[in-house]
Design a protein with these regions (language model features):
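AMP-forming adenylation/ATP pyrophosphatase catalytic core
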Residues: 21, 133-370
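ATP-dependent adenylation/nucleotidyltransferase module used to activate substrates
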Residues: 1-166, 177, 186-187
Length: 370
């Protein structure tokens, strides 16, 4: 290819189309800006394995139809890629392992990490496409001083999705485009209406795609063929106060559905998976100051060399809280919040910020009162 031919080539973009309004508008924005777009939807589950009828999930057969219709309206190539085997291995199997070990996993973060920004980037490269584009509400920018790629919050605070993207690496960020990061949801829907997209008024997906009804314990039993046995509810003093229906069915901080009459509200405070016990207590028992994390990914800095003031989230929609982060060995850190936080939970992500910039994050391994 000559230099003239190379510079005249329009950049190519793989659009990860979920069938929702956000990724559809992301595709339209990239096409408007001069990119040669190819729409791709990942098939992650089989119809017979997951019943999504009437539920707001993603990547269902209905979503594939919607994505294909938008791609047709835009006159762009469109493909469905079958990732069901890898999705089961990397997402579903891990989801079950973490729950069975007593944690609370976040499969949407793992899906971004292993599927969207790994498999799709490799597919894009193999097909000569320069970028992978998604409909996430976050921003990617390059720091002129350091040359590092930065992940920033989306301007729409109510839709910001930077928390679920903290695992993006420098190599990935260099090829990722997030055109909705500077828009508000209302603007996105307005564009979809103007373009007469079939999904302009479609509800956002709200649940885990392979557990759309939210009953993850039933899904796990159906998927594995196991039965999770009943066990003892204990109070914080170790005394039996009732019988639960299987420790995997409960999450830290849960109040509803316990079936206990103890004269005052009680919450799930701890689980012992080997003993199959669930400890309940007053809400005050849920608050912890120290969080330990591993599987760390740094974005704004190459590594953590010493204590650093940050703000942090231990849940998706939590307002960031002030804290200090300390190195704690290879691929790990210790985070000390200024004030105790409610129910930080092993298995969930803890994401660190400085202003609107994502510093990095990791997976919570344990918590402590401090």
């Amino acid at each position: 290819m000559t230099e003239t031919q190379n510079t005249s080539r329009r950049p190519g973009a793989l659009i990860a189309m979920s069938g929702g309004v956000d990724s559809s508008v992301a595709a339209w924005l990239m096409q408007r800006d001069g990119f040669d777009c190819t729409g791709v939807t990942m098939r992650l589950t089989r119809n017979e394995a997951v019943n999504t009828e009437g539920l707001h999930t993603c990547c269902s057969e209905r979503d594939i139809e919607d994505a294909a219709e938008v791609a047709y309206a835009m006159d762009i190539p469109y493909e469905v890629l079958d990732f069901t085997a890898d999705f089961q291995e990397k997402i579903i199997d891990k989801f079950i392992r973490v729950y069975e070990a007593g944690g609370t996993p976040n499969p949407c973060i793992d899906c971004n990490r292993y599927m969207k920004f790994d498999h799709l980037l490799r597919w894009a490269e193999a097909h000569g496409l320069d970028h992978v584009v998604t409909g996430h509400y976050a921003r990617v920018e390059q720091d002129e001083a350091t040359g590092r790629w930065l992940l920033k919050k989306g301007l729409d605070e109510n839709k910001d999705q930077s928390y679920v993207l903290y695992n993006l690496t420098q190599e990935q960020l260099a090829h990722v485009r997030l055109p909705l990061g500077s828009l508000h949801k209302s603007e996105v829907r307005a564009i979809a209406e103007q373009q007469h997209f079939v999904n302009a008024r479609k509800h956002d997906s709200q649940d885990i795609c392979f557990v759309p009804d939210g009953d993850y314990a039933r899904f796990m039993e159906d998927f594995t063929g196991k039965h999770y046995p009943a066990g003892d509810f204990l109070d914080v003093g170790g005394r039996k106060v009732g019988t639960h229906s299987g420790a995997v069915r409960y999450t830290i901080g849960q109040r509803k559905g316990l079936g206990l009459a103890m004269g005052a509200p009680v919450y799930v405070c701890a689980k012992d998976m080997q003993a199959n016990t669930v400890t309940v207590g007053p809400e005050s028992e849920l608050f912890d100051t120290i969080v330990y994390a591993n599987e760390v990914n740094w974005i704004a800095i190459p590594e953590l060399k010493g204590p650093l003031r940050v703000t942090a989230r231990t849940r998706y929609h939590q307002t960031e809280q002030p804290a200090t982060v300390y190195p704690a060995g290879p691929d790990s850190f210790r985070l000390e919040f200024d004030q105790p936080q409610r129910a930080p939970t092993p298995g969930q992500a803890v994401v660190l910020y400085q202003g609107d910039v994502v510093l990095g994050g990791g997976t919570i391994t344990q918590v402590a009162k401090g």
